Amino acid sequence: MASTHAAGSPAPSSSINSPILHPVNASVSNASLGEGSIRFSPAPPSTFSNQGDGVRSKRNKRDSRKKREAKGLDQESAPPKKKSVAVLNTAIPSSDLGILRPIAVGEPRHSDLFPPQPRQLNFAVRKMSGVIGQSWDFYEVVDKLTNKNGFRYSYAIADTDFPHIKYRQTDVPPYHARFSFEDSPAAILFSKDALAVTTNEPWHTARANVCAREGTYYYEARIISGIMSSSEATTSNGSNALPSRGHVRLGFARREADLDVNVGVDCYGYGIRDVNGEVVNRMRCEYFFPKGESIREGDVIGMLITLPPLSLHRKIVEGTYDPACDNFKPGPASATNIIRDRIPFHYKNDFCWQQSNVFPTKQLRDYAFNLKETPAFGPPSPLNAEDPSLRTLPGSSITIYKNGIKMGTPFKELYAFLPPASRLANGTNNLGLGERENADDGMIGYYPAVSCYGGGAVECRFQGPWWFSPPSATENGEPVKGIGERFDEQIVEDVLADIVDEVEAMLVWGSVDGNVVNNAEMDAPGVGAVGGTDVLKGGVGAAYDPATTLSTAPAESNGSGTASIKLADEDACHTGFEDTMSLGVANTPITDVPVPPEPEDTPMTGG
């Protein structure tokens, strides 16, 4: 539509029919019209014209329905909450459990009457310490069993004196308190006597084969490779800095503690760092040593642990503890129902047990990773009602010594460990119910533990002679014993538990022929598998009676009082009775007896 106004008159500002020239057509308009005759009407305000630079205004984003419900909004439209169903705890107390019927296995082989062979060791590295003036050879354990994936492994030996359970507990050389081959990662290297450990990899932890359950026990650890002393540092690099040849951490740990990290990273371990002498628990480091003091090569650290009697411990985990009437003094002795739900199997040429291991509880795992000092379910205490794993032991503590000098007691009120504070990972019956997760196998407690990093190495002594003698008694008059004494005590406990299992199996499954070991009798007179009483009389290494052997030969010694290490290229198989082996103890003869023809219908007699 054409405009009715003259060419020079101003255009009405409100007319929508006014010509609006686009900037692209500006050159054409300038050629046909004069500069003074052009008029532009103002464009109506619009959001798009204000965003010519590409900047868009922010849009108020509304939270989703789930977020609003989580924040407590939209209560009217929120769906009703589901009623929580209480899960019944089907676990049976350890005192009420009985033996499980063993899994049907074949008759024991003749080779099962022999003790397990010594572990094969391959040389890995040699460590030398200028401060101590000594060197150590470390070896890699070949084809070893490792406690992992919720299972724990031990060794068995066939015994004719146990016709119902057929096998009893035993161990591998060396026969003394030491670091456990099975309770350590594959990266851990051992000395020949298994008293020193090291690793060239990141943090790994090795636990001992003895544990403390009650009483006061002590062990010492000497740093072989770690933070160098000031004299060595000045000589090596000419400065006052203290370089290191690795790092170590020392302490105590339970079976739930992870072995691929350092001791003290969770609630199941208590440790001390070599750097600044800091103590560690729940991943929290606290200063303990005086400022500027560390643990260096050649230092000897003494670890003293004190635990209350098992009678008081049971009251705490059962929830019947009363601080007004229950004290730290041991009460009347009570029997402990040791339940070992084990599955026998052959591994290589040895016979082994597989049993459930304990696993970390959710409460302690959450508490370890919780940044708050006081969790929502209450602080750990002997009277914590949330969960037995959160209960602590009154009167328990860990005291640390350095070179014979008491540095203090950084840890008190240790966590309880008796079931149900500790639970088996696979404590289920045939129906999948966790009825047996509270079973106590007699080896749940606090173990000496050492962590190594990047070449750090530690040597331990679990019994005398000590580098620095421990105190004879605690401040409360409790006698102090070397934790190595637990080794012989554990042997007695194992033999007693085997006898109880045999008697219970005989009563439960009566009318079973006792001669079920396939008449596997040693033919040489006086030579055979030793029963429980013989082990107690003859000692740990008395798997054979050397006084009754027909011919003997001296065992090859390595100069340290123990038998030589079996190399990887040697034959590791049990071929028969003529294939005998050294037991790893000094002056133990090796029998060389030809195998006579097996007598017919030879009756078996119980020892």
Curated annotation (Swiss-Prot):
Q: Name one GO biological process term.
A: epigenetic regulation of gene expression
Stretches of Basic residues bias are at 57-69
One of the record's GO molecular function terms: transcription cis-regulatory region binding
Q: Where is this region: Disordered?
A: 1-22, 34-86, 587-607
Designated gene of the protein: cclA
Function, as annotated, reads: Component of the COMPASS (Set1C) complex that specifically mono-, di- and trimethylates histone H3 to form H3K4me1/2/3, which subsequently plays a role in telomere length maintenance and transcription elongation regulation. Controls the production of several secondary metabolites, including monodictyphenone, emodin and emodin derivatives, as well as two anti-osteoporosis polyketides, F9775A and F9775B.
Predominant location of this chain?
Answer: nucleus
Q: Which PANTHER family match?
A: SET1/ASH2 HISTONE METHYLTRANSFERASE COMPLEX SUBUNIT ASH2, SET1_ASH2 HISTONE METHYLTRANSFERASE COMPLEX SUBUNIT ASH2
Q: What happens when the gene is disrupted?
A: Impairs tri- and dimethylation of H3K4. Leads to increased production of several secondary metabolites, including monodictyphenone, emodin and emodin derivatives, as well as two anti-osteoporosis polyketides, F9775A and F9775B.
The question of whether Ion transport is a record keyword is answered with no
Annotated Gene Ontology cellular components are: chromosome, telomeric region; Set1C/COMPASS complex
Name the protein family: Belongs to the cclA family.
Subcellular location, record wording: Nucleus; Chromosome, Telomere
Q: Where is the composition biased (Low complexity)?
A: 1-19
Give the transmembrane region(s).
none
What the entry lists under PROSITE patterns is as follows: B302_SPRY
Superkingdom field: Eukaryota
Could you confirm whether the keyword Protease appears in this record? no
Supply the name of the protein: COMPASS component cclA
Residues in domain B30.2/SPRY? 157-376
Keywords for this entry? Chromosome, Nucleus, Telomere
Oligomer and partners:
Component of the COMPASS complex.
SUPFAM superfamilies per UniProt = Concanavalin A-like lectins/glucanases (SSF49899)
Species in which this protein is naturally found: Emericella nidulans (strain FGSC A4 / ATCC 38163 / CBS 112.46 / NRRL 194 / M139)
